[in-house]
Curated annotation (Swiss-Prot):
TM segment ranges: 44-64
UniProt xrefs under Gene3D superfamilies: 1.50.10.10, Glycosyl hydrolase family 63, N-terminal domain
GO biological process: oligosaccharide metabolic process
Species per Swiss-Prot/TrEMBL record: Mus musculus
Entry protein name: Mannosyl-oligosaccharide glucosidase
Gene: Mogs
Amino acid sequence: MARGERRRRAAAAEGARPLERARAAGRRDGRAGGARGSASGAALAVVVLALAFGLSGRWVLAWLRVRRALTLHPAPSALPPDSSSPAVAPELFWGTYRPHVYFGMKTRSPKPLLTGLMWAQQGATPGTPPKLRHTCEQGDGVGPYGWEFHDGRTFGRQHIHDGALRLTTEFVKRPGGQHGGDWSWRVTVEPQASGTPSFPLVSLFFYVVTDGQEVLLPEIGAKGQLKSISGHTSELGDFRLTLLPPTSPGDTVPKHGSYNVFWSSNPGLPQLTDMVKSRLNSWFQHRPPGASPDRYLGLPGSLKWEERGPSGQGQFLIQQVTLKAPFSVEFVFESGSAATGGNQASGRLVGSQLTQALESHAAAFKERFEKTFQLKEKGLSPEEQALGQVALSGLLGGIGYFYGQGLVLPDTSMEGSEQKMDPALFPPVPLFSGVPSRSFFPRGFLWDEGFHQLVVQRWDPHLTREALGHWLGLLNADGWIGREQILGDEARARVPPEFLVQRAAHANPPTLLLPVVHMLEGHDPDDLAFLRKAFPRLHAWFSWLHQSQAGPVPLSYRWRGRDLALPTLLNPKTLPSGLDDYPRASHPSTAERHLDLRCWVALGARVLSQLAEQLGETEAAAELGPLAASLEEPGSLDELHWAPELGVFADFGNHTKAVQLKSRPPQGLVRVVGRPPPRLQYVDALGYVSLFPLLLQLLDPSSPRLGPLLDVLADSRHLWSPFGLRSLSASSLFYKQRNTEHDPPYWRGAVWLNINYLALGALHHYGHVEGPHKVQAAKLYHELRANVVRNVRQQYQATGFLWEQYSDQDGRGMGCRPFQGWTSLVLLIMAEEY
């Protein structure tokens, strides 16, 4: 029986005795007994009322917390009104904002017009349907693929390798009018091997999707060819889409193609691929003049409206063109207002004019790239320069625009009680953001985005202001931002149900402050004007982090949301930290003190304090300045996190290292805790977390703690590898250990580019300021930079991909790919921009 239950039963028994005595006395003295009975009844009524008011008060507080969790923050937006509209930002209205598809464009709108590409090689495997390619997938066998050039606004060129095929997708935008201007695509299909005796038969599928009441009117030419699509929307006005006849690559002479078309109501964006697959059920003949026919599976041969859905559901129109490679096809969007505004006089952006525009944009990209990052001037090889261009282009080409409602589990301020509540929908919000991986994580992640914008802001500061403004627009009334943004049907369809809900008690590293630091140091007037508007939201976000994640003692902090100590977990994960399975205290408790979180809060206090002073926010500066000073005071950090027995900084909590996974049939692998039993102590997990005071440059150059951290960093028995700093010491009991039977190691030894970037920035800093460790830091900086750059380049040359993580044993890429999120930081490492 629980102690609380025993207390309740004892109190109930003791409470009965006085009442019995009063009743006995009342029998002896009726009048006195009546008076005492009235007093007792009044007292009981008071108790009942107090309990009722207490319970109702708790319910009211809980209701208010739920309401605040699901209410947007009242502070003014950091962005102008209608900042995504064609009237305010016409040059950004259209874009490749669908990172999860191999090639597609959409408008920055809650009800967008969407376009996209699918393809299939016909007859590649006799007797089986062709493999239809549309969305980027980890296991579909396509690759390598990615953007060779992408400037984030007006131009891009991508190469896709798919078995025997090599596709090149290109686009150019042309400004004009009031609705975002015109754009043109060119898709080129060639055999992978030159001089092949037989040319593959390939179908390309170009489609248009509306998401509401918009009008599409197709015009069909001879033999089922979709000549054009006329349309109108409230945001685009009148427009026309035209699919030109295929030609040989680099030529303007048309080639013979076979055409099929399909038109229906919009089945829902996640169902587009399946709908097309289900309609590829009829055999047709592709018969060029003077050549033998080839059979292919095609869409229905004539245009007819199918599956008319409810009003407002939208339309889906797709054209299939089939012929033998090599060939090119161009797809053109023309805005009605751009035509009347002068673009018509310039002619359509097709053929030789399109070629000229593509070449001009490619040359301009290369010139601007060198001017911005100066890799050639700094002595980087041509291969490294190309790697830098691909890293930047992949990051910019992965920027998406999302709109929808996320699922949120409100914070009741009582850990564990959230499990008794149902998640609810957050208000509909837009998000303009980079993504970590087009194939595996094609959505916004809070702690990734800060690293993304470190790269983007060097290239296009306006894009960074747009992204930060959108992320800060997700703030709820308490100042919380969900760490993973799953907005819209397409994003939701790619996430397992158990990961859809974002918990309003859980934080994430505040990496959006990293590009804010660069803004502060750069003194760009546009950046400072943005920060002035953004400050109330930045302050609210930081205040929520500082207060909600407070630890058991002053100036300590604890990540809320660690996994429960289940019998199958070697070490309960801490997903909110971003470091997932990095070892923490073996037995989660409220007594934990997390070093990395304290360092993030210290960085936040420093940045917000400096920003408040620069903006003249005196009240906020008076609050934040002392907090920043306290958090950076060496004695406080030492007292809470320096582990003398380990010789490094560390987490603190209820911990034992006597844990392991053992086979226990039929359960499988289960955690076994040996001796000594857990006790409150520093956590002996030397790795990335141990370095955080160094990584975030919180240590004075003369600090006696700096030397030991540099020694650990440089020790191959611990963190140093020929490929970068490993995430966990090679001497750790958790090194490369699975966390469960089905959960391989993640942050337990692999090399991660984001932390290596922070380490290089810190080494660069300490190697350039006076102090006893200046020479050692500078030497380590040059060696680590060379190792990281060399390995990322070699792996890219071998595989054609940037990877999520790299092996500390042989350098090979691991995890998902392409991963042109924070791995694109290799560009800043090559440019020595920290």
